[in-house]
Structure formats: C-alpha cells, structure tokens
Amino acid sequence: MAFPGCPYIQEKRQYLKEIIMSARMNNPATILPDASDGIQTMLKAVYKGGVPRKTLELVHLRASQINGCSFCVDSGARSAKKAGETDERLFAVAAWRETPYFTDAERAALALAEAVTRLADRSDPVPDEIWEEATRHYDEKGLAAIILMITITNLFNRVNITVRQPAGEATW
C-alpha cells in the first residue's frame, strides 16, 4: 500500500469507496417499468438487425469506454465474451485503429460509435467519410441496428453514471 499514513490518500480512498460501492438510487428504468420494457424491446430489435452480435458488443464497449461508465464497460466486456469475443480483441478495443485485430466492417462500426458518442467534439459530429465507410459495410437495416445500439448504450451510460451504479451489479 503506497503512502499508508497520508491523510489525503486515506480520505480520497474513503470517498472513492463510498461513491463506488453503492448506487445513489435504484436504476430508474426499474422504478418506471414501462421504460425498461421499451428499452428491452429496442434491444431485441437491434439484435435482429443483421449485424453480428460481437460487432454490436464491441460498439457498446467502445461507447462505454469513451463515456467512462464502469458498469457498462464491465458488463459490455462480459457480454462480448459470452458472444464469443476474444481477450485479445477486447483488450484492443480502445486502440482499435492501431491494431490488426478488427475487420473493415468492425472498424466502420467503431468509428461510427465514436462519432455518435462524441457529438460535441466537432461541428460536423458524424462526418461524411465516417458515414460513407459505414454504408459500404452495412445496409440500412444494419446501420439502424448499429445506430440504435450506440444510442441505447449512451442512454445506459448516462443513467448508470448519474446514479453511480457500481460495476458488477446487474440492474438492467
């Protein structure tokens, strides 16, 4: 343990323990069950959209990494593993541009996920080149599935970050 006697470190650890170990409230979608039902219906449609499950899980994981949602990064990695994703690729998602592990179609989906998640970062949030690359790999139904996965993920991220949902606790 580094700096065991340092009051600042001890205070910071206690603060982190308090905010990380318990949520501020129950998941709002469980408080308003109709909301949860609607989200689950959308997710079912996304998974029927013709995009490989592993690709959708990578999109979810990347958006969650960008937003800093520990709950969604944890659950996203677990879901990707269940879908057959490898550790090698999971470890490389944050650096997908610099690794050889992803197909061109997956790269297009990841680029779209980053653009849609970072809407405020530029005046043209989803540039034509990102959109056109995505349309080279996915038909309209596939694009719809990817876009909805990105937006649902951003919804999950914002809910879980707001209520400080701890990683590892199932709430959805």
Regions found by a protein language model. Give the residues of each.
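Hydrophobic alpha-helical segments
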Residues: 2-172
